[in-house]
Amino acid sequence: MSRIILNTKIWLFVLLFGMSFPAWAQSDDFNTWTKFKVNYKIDSRFSVSGDLELRMKDDVSRLDRWGLTVGGSYRPCSFLNLGVGYETHLRNLGDSDWKFRHRYHITATVSFRYQWLKVSLRERFQQTFDRGDSETRLRSRLKSSYAPTKGIVSPYFSVEIYQSLDDTSFWRANRMRYRPGVEIALAKRWSLDAFYCYQYASSQGRHIAGIEVGYSF
């Protein structure tokens, strides 16, 4: 609980001051992310899911990666959701060189709702394996959204911090994402998430336009 409180304070600081800088120190790239998600609800508490993702990079001139994810979630109570997942990525390294990498993640999400406002805090531990090397990170995401009880459109804004667990300095942010978007209930089983994301990293920033289509049954 103390970790969640501490991360929440950091999130508030980032939200207030993290976007106040007039420019980033590196040249930015424009990317697109496209994802199709399927979710099967076993009962009121358990569900399984899978998704297929395509990412483009270098100002949408080159394929970045294909991604496949499978996972499951358990909701022990109304405000807490626990999940696990496995991901595999086929990445484009350029010069006709491709490689696979694998990742697993463990997630805990706490969410609260007051009238039309919904706020959630997600903590995700992930470990990535890449040609014998491994990378361990903690991803912390704070998300607020307009979620009326009746309606099909829900705009939102989220901020996410990536923190390395491999370094001695824990509070060094490897990556940050600022993401405004809108979720739309297209039909009883279909949903659409359209978003813009700015990803800050020390190597290069990215402007990302994304579409996620979901099907639930």
What are these regions (language model features)?
Residues F21-A25:
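Sec/Tat signal peptide C-region and signal peptidase I cleavage site
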Residues S44-G50, F79-V84, Y114-V119, K150-S154, ...:
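Repeated loop/turn-to-beta-strand initiation elements of outer-membrane beta-barrel proteins
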Residues L52-D58, Y86-N92, F112-W116, F125-F129, ...:
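Transmembrane beta-strands of outer-membrane beta-barrel pores
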